[in-house]
Curated annotation (Swiss-Prot):
GO terms for molecular function: cobalt ion transmembrane transporter activity. Belongs to the CbiM family. Signal peptide: none annotated. Its main location: membrane. The chain crosses the membrane at residues 9-29, 43-63, 75-95, 107-127, 134-154, 160-180, 181-201. Keywords: Cell inner membrane, Cell membrane, Cobalamin biosynthesis, Cobalt, Cobalt transport, Ion transport, Membrane, Transmembrane, Transmembrane helix, Transport. It comes from Rhodobacter capsulatus (strain ATCC BAA-309 / NBRC 16581 / SB1003). This is Cobalt transport protein CbiM. GO terms for cellular component: ATP-binding cassette (ABC) transporter complex. GO terms for biological process: cobalamin biosynthetic process; cobalt ion transport. Residues 30-42, 96-106, 155-159, 202-222 are cytoplasmic. It is a multi-pass membrane protein. Part of the energy-coupling factor (ECF) transporter complex CbiMNOQ involved in cobalt import. The complex confers cobalt uptake upon expression in E.coli; can also transport nickel with a very low affinity. A Cbi(MN) fusion protein has about 70% import capacity, but the holo-Cbi(MN)QO complex cannot be isolated, suggesting CbiN may destabilize it.
Length: 222
């Protein structure tokens, strides 16, 4: 998913950075409030960031000029809400760009918009809808992580198509081509990420009722 350094036109790089900015600011405010009101949630915040860092660093090269990998943002999104992952995701992407040459500084805004904003918002929305539909916590978390991951790659496909539309079929044709290439590796990875996220939630929360697990992780219950 990480679009490599210098791959996007300058105007696109700036535009995606400006689009991501307000979400990151809102996330910083949310994190500050969480830490002030629930200091015990700091460990889970750190674990959410580490989970995203490790999973999104497992990259599989793709011929689209990007790569495929799990995103790991679903965990933090379902526990703390999507705005928190905007900040954690940017930190993850920045470290990966500087230390692993994964992504880049000029494409940080675009990568953040797809992985740290769209993915977490979709994951959070799916989790809420699944819960209201009567799904168990495990099913809701799985669907959230699975669809949040896929939403990230759909967004990246659209970003790449906007930058490089197909000469014949235009934006839609390019988006379908980028998306189809990602899908070969990403659908299996998204399924695996869904199962792994459920396992991690269970491991971090311990042996408590499903309805209390996320509240405990978020520092809202003891």
């Amino acid at each position: 998913m990480h679009i490599m350094e210098g791959y996007l036109p300058v105007t696109h790089a700036i535009g995606w950075s400006l689009a991501a900015g307000p979400f990151v600011v809102a996330g910083a405010v949310k994190i500050r409030k969480i830490v002030a009101e629930r200091p015990e949630a700091r460990m889970t915040l750190a674990a959410s960031g580490a989970f995203a860092f490790v999973l999104s660093a497992l990259k599989i090269p793709s011929v689209t000029g990007s790569c495929s990998h799990p995103t790991g943002t679903g965990l933090g999104a379902v526990v703390f809400g999507p705005s928190v992952m905007a900040v954690l995701g940017v930190i993850v992407l920045l470290f990966q760009a500087l230390l692993l040459a994964h992504g880049g500084l000029t494409t940080l805004g675009a990568n953040a918009f797809s992985m740290a904003i769209v993915g977490p918002w979709v994951a959070w929305g799916v989790y809420k809808l699944a819960g209201k539909a009567g799904a168990s916590m495990a099913v809701a978390v799985f669907l959230a992580a699975f669809l949040g991951d896929l939403a990230t790659y759909v967004t990246t496909s659209l970003q790449l198509a906007l930058a490089y539309p197909d000469p014949v079929s235009g934006f839609l044709g390019a988006a379908l081509k980028f998306g189809s290439v990602f899908a070969l590796t990403q659908i299996p990875l998204a399924i695996a990420e869904g199962f792994l996220t459920v396992i991690v939630v269970d491991a971090l929360a311990g042996k408590v009722d499903d309805k209390d697990k996320l509240r405990i992780l978020a520092g809202e219950a003891r």
